């Protein structure tokens, strides 16, 4: 009969052996949190290793993702499709055990973690998703959505500022099914955290309206079990269980020190650990009886079977609700989607209007969201400016089944929370702020791209066109930095029609985020043929053409397209053959086949001009090294928008003059 400590030691030794074998990794945290993990995973976690995607599973998030071997050991021991050979390939090319957990690479990994604190933020999003979905779909006696979100965090996660943003909001939202375990070992890479992290964590979380369980012995299984039971009794507050642990537990010479944090322990020390823990087995060998104690496939399958039976009864009693639930969970758009969106886009083209693209975005939401209950929006305290609310928005603070989150001034937290909402399933999140403040959200934006998360970023006030607020609020380099990030589609529409198309493409995109870059100021609408209207969805299309062998091509986006078109027509009046290309989404255009790209930007035309109120460098890929770019070289200034556009050269006359020089060169 194996004790709980011996079962936990299986985690410790697998982690130690994998790190040693890879000659790289972090053994200390898995050794320190193994006892907590054993209690949670064997006694409380609702999951099915035979079906990692079971909809009503509990979510487990390893926010301190450097300790990934803890999670891989758990997945292997409980019966997920992660054989011992994969643990032997830890941190190696093409393995299922990368250095930090990556969703999509390893069965059972809910979200990619590693940048500290973001896993915690994702978990807050998952807890929001669980509660909002359950409030919408559950009925008396049919709690088809009823699961917990469990999180492991370390000192580093709680030092990161994002932890304040998301834990403050989680307490405000009373997320009672969010339970966090804090691995309080007092050690980080530089040494003892007492020299730089003296917060009273318990009081901090009490101030956030969390239920706090302090001074829990993280190596005492009974204490851990009691604390989890107490946490589950509290339904109107998230809980944090502060566990006092020893990093590198079991290592005679390196436990409790930074030496055990992020490097292999060495063969000599590992031999001593085996003696200390009485683990008399060679590397990567686990006794059959321990495997048997850990394996959760049979129990997990029973849990899912019971849920399936309940859902079958739910389907019989609530056929419409159950059909809608399955549609959303399976990420299917409504049957009327194409009809509604295409009709709306055609309507806009026929009913021309000069409005800001942020207003066009709100109008589009009003139309599309009516048939998309899975849309869940939010803004970082800029809803009236971003125009992200529509007539049927309900705050989830006031209505648990609502569709809008007031995130407060928390751009980073907002973005990472919505990543978690997306990964939970059942929702398409959109989040909003000024384009300039993507800088606050940057790493969560990158993580969305890395994970191919379906998440729509709404970034308004997109250029010097926001005017008097000045260079602190005027984006310059942000557009380019977003465009060069893999997996993100960045749309900068020029009028209400392109805005509606951008929203349609963002919602239809199945893998990866989309950024909608929207103006503060009004934009004129352009005439288009039916072919041009259809070609918007290809990312770039011919807006104006002289219909003969071309002398010059203009490329522009957003608010600068109108002055570019006027300048081009002025050149055409002199007899030059010109083309104007609207390029609202460069990445979508880049994915088109060679024939379409040659059709829009024929290679024989070397004289090209790009016009956009953002940093110039990005556009050389389209105009060539000898092309002309009318863009930003510096930061902006504080002045009315019209004065700034004139100062920085976004005028018909300047575009005309520079193009004429190019033509005569």
Swiss-Prot record:
GO molecular function: metal ion binding; transketolase activity
Biased composition range(s): Low complexity: 97-114
Stored SUPFAM superfamilies: Thiamin diphosphate-binding fold (THDP-binding), TK C-terminal domain-like
EC number: 2.2.1.1
GO cellular component, one term: cytosol
Binding site residues for substrate: 26, 261, 358, 385, 461, 469, 520
Keyword DNA damage: no
UniProt keywords, alphabetically: Calcium, Magnesium, Metal-binding, Thiamine pyrophosphate, Transferase
PROSITE patterns reported in the protein's UniProt record: TRANSKETOLASE_1 (PS00801), TRANSKETOLASE_2 (PS00802)
Family classification: Belongs to the transketolase family.
PANTHER family hit by this protein: TRANSKETOLASE, TRANSKETOLASE 2
Protein task: Catalyzes the transfer of a two-carbon ketol group from a ketose donor to an aldose acceptor, via a covalent intermediate with the cofactor thiamine pyrophosphate.
Subunit structure and binding partners: Homodimer.
Name of the molecule in the record: Transketolase
Highest classification ranks of the organism: Bacteria, Pseudomonadati, Pseudomonadota, Gammaproteobacteria, Enterobacterales
